[in-house]
Amino acid sequence: MTTAAAAWFAVVFFLLPGFLVAWVAGLRVPAAVTTALPVTFGVIGVSSWMWGVTSAPFNLWTFGVSMVLALAVAGGWRYAFARKARRGGDVPWHRALFPGKVEWTHWGIPFVGVAVAAWMAVTDRLSWLAQMPNGADNIVQGWDSQWHANAVRFVMETGVASSTRMGELQNFETHARLFYPSGFHAGVALFAEAAGLEPIRAVNIASTVLPAVALPLTMV
């Protein structure tokens, strides 16, 4: 997969799960899009912890199970509010499940701005990476980048992504307990597995795409 294709794939991969959960829970499409990224990582964070207390590895299959559970909870949440809205029988089910309407004219320009800003940020960073030795496979020579790449590789190789079990990586000799927020690393590990990327390349692409998409979305 080329770097550009992987970047486009990352946009869909990180936005789609959160969008589906937010929309099923009752948000309208524009609001579901704007909240998609934090919802995705919320599901990933809870999922990685949940599977960390079992013997099952955290990977695309177990995350898929978590998505089914999240969608079921979101659907139950929406149904409960729709049922409450229908008390008395005056409101039809469709109206109760999909109240109001979306004024697309109010959302069009902001979303165009988000798309343009994200595209500019991603293309600038990817162009910079392309000029480096080994391109997107080049790791920045700093503690943070190396730690993040190591954490992603650890998740991919062991299936351990729980934030309460990061001592198994950082305290390699003793495995002393350590809490470290690992939602980013769990998400990037899933992305790398789905796209067939090595950890360093996945970290570089995800570190480019995620802030480029998240920052303009916060301004909508």
Residue ranges and their predicted role:
Residues I109, A117-V220:
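Active-site lumenal/periplasmic loops and adjacent helix-entry segments of GT-C-fold
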Residues V39, V43, S47, V65, ...:
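Lipid-exposed faces of alpha-helical membrane segments in multi-pass integral membrane proteins
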Residues M1-W107:
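Membrane-embedded, hydrophobic transmembrane alpha-helices
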